Amino acid sequence: MQFKKLTPPTEGEKIEVKDGRLQVPDNPIIVWIEGDGTGPDIWRAAHPVLNTAVELAYGGKRKIVWFEAYAGEKAQAVYGELLPEDTFKAIAEYIVAIKGPLTTPVGTGFRSLNVTLRQELDLYACVRPAKWYEGVPSPMRHPEKVNMVVFREATEDLYAGIEWEKGTPEAQKVIEWLKKEMGVEVRADSGIGIKPISEFASKRLVRKAIQYAIDNKLPTVTFMHKGNIMKYTEGAFMKWAYEVALNEFRDYVVTEQEVTTQYGGKAPEGKIVVKDRIADNMFQQIQTRPDEYHVIATMNVNGDYISDALAAMVGGLGMAPSANMGDYIALFEATHGSAPKYAGKDVVNPSSVILSGVMMLRYIGWNEAADLVEKGISETIKQKRVTYDLARHIGVEPIKCSEFGQAVCENMREIAKKL
């Protein structure tokens, strides 16, 4: 693979796909993108945590070989563009990548860098776990009941970026066409956006969500939609979701209706209950009955909203990991923004990118290292050694971003001694 300005590591081996499965060497090359704003801060904490976990879990027999690629402001400085071809090529070639937050100029016509990465690499599933860690302040009375994973379709819906500004020739042309050809009146001073929801994209997203529930022995998958209003987009998503469940996973699933009519209200042992919820009701459900939901499969906009709401319930975006997945390529990322006003101040919570690293470790099958990181973070928070975002709720003096990373490493070493 030839790059314009990137130099691959001289050590390490590529992760490969054979017979539909990842083949992970003991020294995999993993692409990382520092990100903008607080990106350098969180990575100075995260890299030592992930490296220490791997070293402790495998006695030095395994090691991540990091390969830096560029996006955002750093890419602009190196390449003169925000998202160079080298970065797409590196992620596609090495399969697994992880990144910090990226800044997209607002209202300037630039498409979101995060959206562009997902669309160009066909990373169609945005996977967002929401899990509470003991000691994290939460507005919920029982945050320990929140343990869900959102599968959000990431290439379509209103976030596809098919829109035109009010007053442009393109917007006027669409408005005129709608009136002339479809008999639909739209105000002349409107901006226009298109909401595509396809059968293909919907079904592959749901397929991935149900397979995740099977692999992780989770009891429910819920299809979230607003099909009562948007019948031919969100309603179609619900219809296609059930088709996947009942045509492709019939041996594994039972519908909520079948549980009621055929099984006396109790799901049969070993079966996954598939059900659907109207989007606005879903926001009530996650607060009032969180333990009844485990995997949520939904479209792009709904998924964005519900995953951020869930993050707030378990400690905020600073505690929220994320992954963008295709069939094999996976890009893990911090969910929070670049927070430029805090850049270089060593104050932000690095847990989002660290926990995204946990997801990454599980994706490559290194569960022992992933478990160690989670235990290290949990222990550090229980000790009330936390950054300002959590400290202000707990009523303790905050520690620095880098100090949090050091504390997690210390706790992992103590935990490893007892294993």
Region spans (language model):
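Buried hydrophobic positions in well-ordered alpha/beta secondary-structure cores of metabolic enzymes
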Residues: D36-G39, I95, F151, A209, ...
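Flexible, glycine/charged-enriched surface loops at secondary-structure junctions
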Residues: Y58-V65, N216-H225, F249-K275, W366-E374, ...
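Glycine-rich phosphate/nucleotide-binding loop
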Residues: Q2-T10, E73-Q76, F283-R385
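N-terminal beta-loop-helix "entrance" segment that forms/cooperates
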Residues: G59-L83
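Glycine-rich phosphate-binding loop
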Residues: A90-T104, E248, Y252-L331, M412, ...
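N-terminal glycine-rich phosphate/adenylate-binding segment common to multiple enzyme folds
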Residues: K74-E181, V301-Y305
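N-terminal phosphate-binding or glycine-rich loops at protein starts, especially the Walker A/P-loop
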Residues: F3-G60
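Glycine-rich phosphate/diphosphate-binding loop of Rossmann-like nucleotide-binding domains
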Residues: P25-D26, V31-H47, K173-R277
